[in-house]
Amino acid sequence: MNAPVDPKKLIKGGLHDWEVIVGMEIHAQVSSRAKLFSGASTEFGAEPNDHVSLVDAAMPGMLPVINAECVAQAVRTGLGLKAKINLRSVFDRKNYFYPDLPQGYQISQYKDPIVGEGEVLVDLADGASITVGIERLHLEQDAGKSLHDQDPTRSFVDLNRSGVALMEIVSRPDLRSSEEAKAYVTKLRTILRYLGTCDGDMEKGSLRADVNVSVRRPGEPLGTRCEIKNVNSIRFIGQAIETEARRQIAILEDGGTIDQETRLFDPTKGETRSMRSKEEAHDYRYFPDPDLLPLEFDQAYVDALAEGLPELPDAKKARFVSAFGLSPYDAGVLVAERASADYYEAVAKGRDGKAAANWVINELFGRLNKEGLSIEATPVSADQLGTIIDLIGEGVISGKIAKDLFEIVWTEGGDPRVVVESRGMKQVTDTGAIEAAVDQIIAANPDKVAQAKEKPTLLGWFVGQTMKATGGKANPAAVNALLKAKLGIE
């Protein structure tokens, strides 16, 4: 029986409402210095064919040798996805011919993958969450890269990428919108980065998505799916799903049928186009690779890797909510990147967690976004930001002065305490000095004084004038208290 459909997720066609069904195959490059079956380097950006071993080039007589670190990284990823780790898995040959595949086959895993079923909890923008099932994770070799822009009449092949270890993470068709799909890939990338098993850099091709899209009328069986290959940004994933769903709906409402095929997304034209008919498993003639023994390890090996796992995003988010009193939303923002979470935790240590979150999210992240910088490149250290928060708490500076201080530390650096002293930024706490400023403003504005008793909101105007007169240095609480007393406002 089909679950009820959320009307907000339906796509309106010309004749009917339609439900989009999305499943994802994520190809994540394993973080490892060497390739899956050779000792060649995986460094990105080298000259073409600089990192190619005899195994990668498929020279006769060369035998693959499994890289143990790639196996460990796959197991760590499986544990991070709450998945079943298979103690015995098998490498198979996936047979097809392509210029950048020198062996004439890809070493992959078919019937017996290293990781079985798991799940990913995905938080959505509207505050809801969904659980996306993971069908499997298997290890496989990447192919090389064909270069078509080096010569007007010839194509070249770069085998630097050939043999690099990939984890193919296959989801169940549990996604029901482009927004859910984007949120899923974002969360999966966050988990991989926390684990240190893939850097998730889509610009470098470290994370690529094959997106399976089909549409159906609510309550009807699944439709025929099309696979959109190698989508290389989260924004493009969303656009590709929307575009392909619309294409399929138009065909079905016109009385046509959907061909199961592989397609490419063209972001400049905003369309998907046919690449080839979709292959089935039998087209690849899978069989166990005779050069590789089955991959076997024991539960003790898995348990040892599990003990070394870092705190993952969901657990960290729950801890931030309980330990620091944060809202789930703020905690989610902070744990989205491991470096951001570590920075926040350093700022919040021994301080008010909510105040620290406000400064990190609103001031720091806001400025980083404006400047196009990552948290790793911030010129304001966690110690410096923590000191600014301390100065507010100690009553040395006001919130307004703190923002000015943050700007100085951002652009010039320095110890915030020293900056406050050297630039005379301490707030005025001497009630006599504040009272003199208040009296002067009251004397200069008798008409507003009369109005204030009838309209208490004018208090804000007097506070602003007092702060202006004191260069923003007056203690706001003292200003408020004095003005209320002198204006007779309760």
From Swiss-Prot:
Pfam families linked to this entry: GatB_N (PF02934), GatB_Yqey (PF02637)
Keyword Signal: no
InterPro entries: Asn/Gln-tRNA_amidoTrfase_suB/E (IPR017959), Asn/Gln-tRNA_Trfase_suB/E_cat (IPR006075), Asn/Gln_amidotransferase (IPR018027), Asn/Gln_tRNA_amidoTrase-B-like (IPR003789), GatB (IPR004413), GatB_C_1 (IPR042114), GatB_Yqey_C_2 (IPR023168), Gln-tRNA_amidoTrfase_suB_CS (IPR017958)
GO biological process, one term: glutaminyl-tRNAGln biosynthesis via transamidation
Assigned EC number: 6.3.5.-
Annotated GO MF terms: asparaginyl-tRNA synthase (glutamine-hydrolyzing) activity; ATP binding; glutaminyl-tRNA synthase (glutamine-hydrolyzing) activity
Family matches, as PROSITE patterns: GATB
Reactions the enzyme catalyzes: L-glutamyl-tRNA(Gln) + L-glutamine + ATP + H2O = L-glutaminyl-tRNA(Gln) + L-glutamate + ADP + phosphate + H(+); L-aspartyl-tRNA(Asn) + L-glutamine + ATP + H2O = L-asparaginyl-tRNA(Asn) + L-glutamate + ADP + phosphate + 2 H(+)
Keywords on record: ATP-binding, Ligase, Nucleotide-binding, Protein biosynthesis
Nucleotide-binding as UniProt keyword: yes
Coiled-coil residue windows: none
Alphabetized NCBIfam families for the sequence: gatB, PRK05477.1-2, PRK05477.1-4, PRK05477.1-5
Family: Belongs to the GatB/GatE family. GatB subfamily.
Function (record text): Allows the formation of correctly charged Asn-tRNA(Asn) or Gln-tRNA(Gln) through the transamidation of misacylated Asp-tRNA(Asn) or Glu-tRNA(Gln) in organisms which lack either or both of asparaginyl-tRNA or glutaminyl-tRNA synthetases. The reaction takes place in the presence of glutamine and ATP through an activated phospho-Asp-tRNA(Asn) or phospho-Glu-tRNA(Gln).
Summary of subunit composition and partner proteins: Heterotrimer of A, B and C subunits.
Protein's name according to its UniProt entry: Aspartyl/glutamyl-tRNA(Asn/Gln) amidotransferase subunit B
Source taxonomy: Bacteria, Pseudomonadati, Pseudomonadota, Alphaproteobacteria, Hyphomicrobiales
Recorded name of the encoding gene: gatB
